[in-house]
């Protein structure tokens, strides 16, 4: 949702493409939209889409790479959650199926290690020169000391060991939050089963407005992200995103209970 605000400040328009909570962005819907023209770029999180947590199947990624290359649509792929997959194997990014250098693969270590490193990377394909120029103009050089420290850490194998433990913790925390929501939220509530990352997308009955109830939740010292913020057209007012990035303590369980009471009140 912060990306929507950034696009707005740049004077760009965002077109919503339907997304399946299990298989990700609809390639068919993107293809239909591209027939109308005017689409310059496709911004996508194919692994651990925020807020759904879904991972696109490889065949869908291959189709998207082929379609966008044929239509001249640049792909900006944010793979920041790829290392935080909750399955047995790390999913491939769309970039792996890019035959035309049309995909700009971006990621960082802010979610898997710490945001204080301020280190990310981009495999920019045909856009490499333009991206390098923009990097120089906007932020100049990156601290070489932290880059070398991180490089040695990655080469040592410690990062992979760290990821195994982190994925296990996130998987447990996501499942604990899912069970808590199922216990305390209104009947007919629907909850995603994330395949990567550490957020839950919760769909409440249509009569519940999570934007309107947000201030009441803050008054109970409970925070969430209203679903409306993930849509430039104001959809998903009956939905919300929950963060599972912290251990599921009794305090968090009680916060979920209080939130469920707010949503269940007449």
Kindly give the residue locations of the regions a language model identified.
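PLP-dependent class I/II
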Residues: 1-266
């Amino acid at each position: 949702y912060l990306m929507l605000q950034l696009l707005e400040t740049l004077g760009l328009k965002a077109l919503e493409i339907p997304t399946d909570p299990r298989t990700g962005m609809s390639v068919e819907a993107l293809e239909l939209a591209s027939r109308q023209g005017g689409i310059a770029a496709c911004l996508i999180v194919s692994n651990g889409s925020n807020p759904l947590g879904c991972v696109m199947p490889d065949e869908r990624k291959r189709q998207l790479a082929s379609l966008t290359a044929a239509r001249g649509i640049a792909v900006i792929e944010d793979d920041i959650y790829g290392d935080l997959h909750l399955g047995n194997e790390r999913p491939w990014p769309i970039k792996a199926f890019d035959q035309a250098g049309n995909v700009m693969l971006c990621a960082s270590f802010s979610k898997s290690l710490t945001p204080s490193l301020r280190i990310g990377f981009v495999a920019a394909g045909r856009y490499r020169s333009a991206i390098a120029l923009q990097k120089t103009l906007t932020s100049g050089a990156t601290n070489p000391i932290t880059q070398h420290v991180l490089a040695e850490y990655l080469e040592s194998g410690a990062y992979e060991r760290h990821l195994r433990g982190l994925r296990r913790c996130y998987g447990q925390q996501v499942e604990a939050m899912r069970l808590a929501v199922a216990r305390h939220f209104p009947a007919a509530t629907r909850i995603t089963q994330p395949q990567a990352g550490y957020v839950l997308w919760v769909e409440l009955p249509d009569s519940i407005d999570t934007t309107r109830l947000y201030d009441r939740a803050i008054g109970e010292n409970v925070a969430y992200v209203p679903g409306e913020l993930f849509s430039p057209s104001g959809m998903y007012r009956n939905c919300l995103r929950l963060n599972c990035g912290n251990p599921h303590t009794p305090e968090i369980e009680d916060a979920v209970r209080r939130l469920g009471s707010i949503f269940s009140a007449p």
